[in-house]
Every structure is written in C-alpha cells, then in structure tokens.
C-alpha cells in the first residue's frame, strides 16, 4: 500500500512524504515538538475547544494520526473468540473526513469526487448535515483524504468552479455489523494468526465451504456470516469427509440457514437441477467442461463414463454430437435424465446406470464395433471422458484388448480424456507413468497433460489426453482390408509447464 503523509513542519511549507508499506503506525517523530505541545494544550482546554466542537461533526486539524486498515474499519476487539453470532456486538464509531456542500450541487460534484468518496458496505456516501438542512456531507476515504491538498487537481478545480470550500471536517460515523465485510468479521472473530475462510463454492442458493480444523469451533458463525454477506445464499454447508464412496458424493452438514439441498445452477448457458447432498457437482470445473466441449465437432461421438448430472454430456449433445452418458449413482442417473429433458437434448443422449468398467466393456464396446463397420469417410471422431480423478486411471484397464477379434483400424482410435489427482513433484510425468502402467504401454510420446486446477497445497487435478494405441485395443492386430500399413503414432504436444494453450490432440481422422 502506498501512503502519502502530509508534513507541515512549524506551520510553513507543506511536504508530502511517500511511504510504501503494508500498515500505518503512529509516528510522532514527524510532528515537531512545538506542534505536539500545542495540540496537547488545546485538548486540555475545554473552554477553547468547545467553541468549534459539535456532537458528531467538527473541524479537522491539518495534522491527524490515522489508524491502519486493520484497525479503523475492523470490528471491535471484544468480538474475538465469539462462536455464536451477536450482531449487536459489532457496533463501533470511527472518525472520518467529510466535505460540506450545498445539496443542489451534490450530484455534479460526486462525479468528480467518486474516487475520493468513502466506499463501505451499507454506508451512503452522501448524508444530511445534522446542523444544516440545506447542506450535505460527502463522506471521504480516510486513507486518501487528509486535508484539502489531498484532492486530485481535477477535484480541486471542480470545487473551485462550484464555489465549494475545500475545508475538510471530521465526522463520527457509526458502524454496525452490516457495514463490515465477511473477511473483516471473521478475521476479528477467529484467533489471531489463523487462516480466515471468506471464500466458498456457490451451488445455486448453497454456499459450500471446506473448513479447517481450527475453524470448526466457529463453524455456525462462519456459515451465518456467509449467508448474511452474500445475496442469494440461504444455506451454508461444510464437507465432513472426502469423496471416497462409490457414488462420488460427500457427507455434509448444514452450518446455518435452510436445510433444502434441492438447487438449480446455470453453467455455460445450460441449466442443471439436482439434490446437492446426493450427487457430485463442482462449480470450479466450469472452464474444464467448456474446454472439452470445444474439442468436439458436430457428428462426433462422446462416451461420458462418469457423467454425473450432465456437465459434459449436455453441452456436447447441443453441438449435434451423439452422446452416451453413464453414472453408477442412481441419483445422478435420475438428475441426468431430468437435465437432458430440461435442456432439450434427451433425444441426443443415451443414458446408462452402470459401473464404469461395465459401461466400457458393454455399451461402449458394442457401439465401437458398430462404428468400425462404417466406411472410412463416415467414421466419426470418438472421445471418451473419464472424470473420476480419484480412480479413473484404474478404469483404463477396461480398454485392454477391448476390440480383440475385430479388424484393426488405425483410422479409428478413440481419444481418451482421463482425469487424475497427483501429489508428485512432477505431476504430469506421474500421471503419464501411472496411466501407461495400467495400459501396459508408454504414453510419453503420444499424450498431453493439462493442469485443470490446484486442489490443495501440493495436490493437482490433471487431465491426460491420448489416442488409445492399437496395441492396447487389439490383442491380435488383424489388418483391416482398407489398411496396408500402420501409420506411426504422432507425438502430441505436451503441457509440462501447464500453459494456457489448448490441448493439441493428434488424430488421423
């Protein structure tokens, strides 16, 4: 933070001292002894001071010490350790600069003073002057405005044009719970030095938090603050276990607000409805859903092995692709059917309720055999999405000799997008090696790895993309009469550095 301090030694020429620091501390060394003594004398002389004093509005001296951000607009210190929210305990009075102006010129003046005006939740920047009905007080930012010299040149010019005195006064502003931000409240309540949770994943009307152990004693308060400070949020929940069950959903507890977990979300132009307590949904994967969707073109085929409620299947179906979507969770299956109808793609998506391996070795195998019989010109590109990061790599074993006995076609090798977590120092290499080990073939030269997101410290979510080698799909590679020789595998561009470039997929189609 850059701070400008006005120094006027002995009442003569002013100088601005520029300090670059993160907090502001009182420093009397900048104030000459004579000035300090004078202000102390005045403060001890009520007879002198009462002439210019008002209850909440009084003249501001040119030299003023200022509290740092962490103090001036922080809740009262006695809320520290509060576990049950008491909104009345957050009342506080702060002293801020104001500018008195005629009420008829306020709107014209505010356009020029917008950057100098105070901006706090629930606080009007212009208020009535308690002592003059024909005037208004513009509340100013105490970290930008110290004296009239603190205004920008343009602002001073407008003040002069409108015949407004730049005299800065001070005003006792009463702050309440409504005027503090969620982070400020939680930072004041939780033990000093502890991490503060101010972020969450929004799922419709639900705020989904992942609280740490030291935050659990304050969980109900945290939940209520999230509801209070985020319009549209009516329920706050906390995950109480990892996603390690067969249905990919997690147990949660409602911290505050309503118990209703039926929600509706909008992602990438599509609407999804579901019971958040019974299915898996992660709003942080929105970009990844779009990335995969953009890789397919009209006429392509998508097999979504762990489809959830449809965030891959539905957008792809909208592109006039043929989609086969599967999920083992009966609730996900139910809402997948519902969302396909809701988004008017139910005629383009075939939906299954099977284990992932059974889906691959059943419907997927059958459809691939059907597609193999098509002529080269009619064969579509086939994509298989496997979004189950905790276990998806294990399911790659289902591709081993999946098409054995069928005529080998190197023009028809499905493209796999398989997701995984990694805690390795080189996560891309780790994912390649683990996937290759399951398939029994090296993927170093024919795969790309995309960083999806950072899940936790030293834990990444990645997507490895590759064409399934013919040596994996066919045990005995009987040549298709259309093919005279196997083309060499193309080396796909890697993403070791996890660049923002799109994943490049080598394809012979």
Swiss-Prot record:
InterPro entries, per database record: MeTrfase_TRM5/TYW2 (IPR030382), SAM-dependent_MTases_sf (IPR029063), TRM5-TYW2-like_MTfase (IPR056743), TRM5/TYW2-like_N (IPR056744), tRNA_Gua_MeTrfase_euk (IPR025792)
Binding site for S-adenosyl-L-methionine: 289, 327-328, 355-356, 387
Catalytic reaction(s) noted: guanosine(37) in tRNA + S-adenosyl-L-methionine = N(1)-methylguanosine(37) in tRNA + S-adenosyl-L-homocysteine + H(+)
GO cellular component, one term: nucleus
Residue numbers spanned by region Disordered: 478-509
Role this protein plays: Involved in mitochondrial tRNA methylation. Specifically methylates the N1 position of guanosine-37 in various tRNAs. Methylation is not dependent on the nature of the nucleoside 5' of the target nucleoside. This is the first step in the biosynthesis of wybutosine (yW), a modified base adjacent to the anticodon of tRNAs and required for accurate decoding.
Protein family membership: Belongs to the class I-like SAM-binding methyltransferase superfamily. TRM5/TYW2 family.
Protein name, as recorded: tRNA (guanine(37)-N(1))-methyltransferase
